[in-house]
C-alpha cells in the first residue's frame, strides 16, 4: 500500500479548496480571521517552495451581508446577484491579506463551459500554469453570475478536482468544517467510525456516501469522494481535513496523520483523457451490449457500431457522449465520430456496412479508443 502520509512530504504543487462553512461568520458575511489565517499559512508554504492554487467559496454569503439580506434567496438571478456583489469582497479580503506577505493574487472565474470546450480548457490551463510560474496565487471560484442551473459545477469540490487536473497538482486539500470522512454522519451517529486512509476508488466508499447518514459538511461526503476520484485521474492525492484545526496545512505538509487521505489507485490518465473524463455533461447516451462493454472495459478497444443497442440525444460529430451498460451504468465517455441521426442508422451493424447504409464512411469506429475514457 505504501506510506501515503510520507508521500505528502514530497508534494510541492497543491490545490487547496476552502468551503463557505469555514469562510463565513455564522453563515453570513466573511470571517476575516479565517481568511487572514488561511492566507498566512499559504504564504508560508509558498515561501518554502510550494505552488498553490486556492479554490474558494463564499461569494454568495459575502454578497448577502453587503446587500443586507438575512435569508439566502431561492431565485437563481438573486443568487447570481449576491455572488456578483460578494465576489468583490471575497477577492478584496484575500488580496489585502496576501499583500501583507508581499504576494500577489489573481482572480479566476470558471464555468462548466470553459472546461467542456477543449480550446477554452487549454487556455485556462495555460493561464493557471503561467500564473504559478510567475509566483502568483490564483484564487478560483465558479462564475456564478453567468452559470445556469443546468450547466453548473454544482459545488467547489468538483471544481477543485478539475483544477487539480488542469495544473497537474500532486495534492488536493479539501478544507471543511469536519475532521474528515466517516462511515456515517458523526453529528447524528456518535459511534461513526473515522476513515483515516483509503483508496480513492474503493467501492465501499460509495455505500457510505449514498447512505442517509453520509453527509459531510454542506457539500456532502459524496461530492468529496467524487472530487478525490477526479483528482486521482491526474495522479493527485486528496486530503479532506478540518480547516478549524490549527496550522492544518503545515501539518499535512509534514505528513502528520490528520484528516482523511484518499490515494490514487489507478494509473493517471493522459492529459486529453483527463479532459474527457472531466466532462460533467454529455450530449447523448449510447447503450452497449455485453460484448462491447467487455472489449471497451477490459481490452481498451474502440467502440464499433455493431456493439451499440440504442442511442439517445441529439449530438453532432465530435461531441461527447456517455456509454452505458445494460443496467444503465455509465462505463465510459468519448468523442463520437457520427452525429445522432447517423448513429441511429448504423448501430447494430458491422463497420463494413457503414458506407452501404450512409453512402459514405468517415471512420470505422463509432468512438476511437484514443477518444474514449473509462469512468
Swiss-Prot record:
It comes from the Bacteria. GO terms for biological process: L-proline biosynthetic process. It is found in: Cytoplasm. Its EC number is 2.7.2.11. Residues 283-361 form the PUA domain. CDD domains: AAK_G5K_ProB, PUA_G5K. Substrate binds at residues 57, 144, 156. InterPro entries: AceGlu_kinase-like_sf, Asp/Glu/Uridylate_kinase, G5K_ProB, Glu/AcGlu_kinase, Glu_5kinase, Glu_5kinase/COase_Synthase, Glutamate_5-kinase_CS, PUA. Its main location: cytoplasm. GO terms for molecular function: ATP binding; glutamate 5-kinase activity; RNA binding. GO terms for cellular component: cytosol. PROSITE patterns: GLUTAMATE_5_KINASE, PUA. Belongs to the glutamate 5-kinase family. Catalyzes the transfer of a phosphate group to glutamate to form L-glutamate 5-phosphate. This is Glutamate 5-kinase. It comes from Nitrosococcus oceani (strain ATCC 19707 / BCRC 17464 / JCM 30415 / NCIMB 11848 / C-107). The lineage of its organism: Bacteria, Pseudomonadati, Pseudomonadota, Gammaproteobacteria, Chromatiales.
Amino acid at each position: 500500500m505504501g506510506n501515503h502520509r510520507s508521500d505528502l512530504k514530497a508534494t510541492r504543487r497543491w490545490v487547496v479548496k476552502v468551503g463557505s462553512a469555514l469562510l463565513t461568520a455564522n453563515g453570513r458575511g466573511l470571517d476575516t480571521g479565517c481568511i487572514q489565517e488561511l492566507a498566512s499559512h499559504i504564504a508560508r508554504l509558498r515561501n518554502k517552495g510550494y505552488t498553490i492554487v486556492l479554490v474558494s467559496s463564499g461569494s454568495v454569503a459575502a454578497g448577502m451581508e453587503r446587500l443586507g439580506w438575512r435569508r439566502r434567496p431561492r431565485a437563481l438571478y438573486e443568487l447570481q446577484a449576491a455572488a456578483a456583489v460578494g465576489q468583490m469582497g471575497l477577492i478584496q479580503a484575500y488580496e489585502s491579506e496576501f499583500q501583507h506577505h508581499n504576494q500577489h493574487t489573481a482572480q479566476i472565474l470558471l464555468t462548466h463551459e470553459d472546461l467542456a470546450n477543449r480550446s477554452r480548457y487549454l487556455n485556462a490551463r495555460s493561464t493557471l500554469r503561467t500564473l504559478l510560474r510567475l509566483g502568483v496565487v490564483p484564487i478560483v471560484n465558479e462564475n456564478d453570475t453567468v452559470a445556469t442551473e443546468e450547466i453548473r459545477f454544482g459545488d467547489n469540490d468538483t471544481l477543485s478536482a478539475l483544477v487539480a487536473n488542469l495544473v497537474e497538482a500532486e495534492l488536493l486539500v479539501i478544507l471543511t468544517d469536519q475532521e474528515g470522512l466517516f462511515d456515517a454522519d458523526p453529528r447524528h451517529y456518535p459511534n461513526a467510525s473515522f476513515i483515516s486512509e483509503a483508496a480513492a476508488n474503493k467501492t465501499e466508499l460509495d455505500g457510505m456516501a449514498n447512505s442517509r447518514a453520509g453527509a459531510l459538511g454542506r457539500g456532502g461526503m459524496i461530492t468529496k469522494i467524487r472530487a478525490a476520484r477526479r483528482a486521482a485521474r491526474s495522479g493527485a492525492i486528496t486530503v479532506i481535513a478540518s480547516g478549524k484545526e490549527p496550522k492544518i496545512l503545515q501539518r499535512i505538509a509534514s505528513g502528520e496523520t490528520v484528516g482523511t487521505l484518499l490515494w490514487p489507485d489507478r494509473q493517471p490518465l493522459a492529459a486529453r483523457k483527463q479532459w474527457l473524463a472531466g466532462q460533467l455533461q454529455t450530449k447523448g447516451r449510447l447503450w452497449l451490449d455485453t460484448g462491447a462493454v467487455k472489449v471497451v472495459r477490459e481490452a481498451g478497444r474502440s467502440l464499433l457500431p455493431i456493439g451499440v443497442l440504442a442511442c439517445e440525444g441529439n449530438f453532432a460529430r465530435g461531441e461527447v457522449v456517455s456509454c452505458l451498460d445494460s443496467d444503465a451504468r455509465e462505463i465510459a465517455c468519448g468523442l463520437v465520430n457520427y452525429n445522432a441521426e447517423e448513429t441511429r442508422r448504423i448501430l447494430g451493424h458491422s463497420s463494413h456496412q457503414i458506407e452501404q447504409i450512409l453512402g459514405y464512411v468517415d471512420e470505422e469506429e463509432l468512438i476511437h479508443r484514443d477518444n474514449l475514457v473509462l469512468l
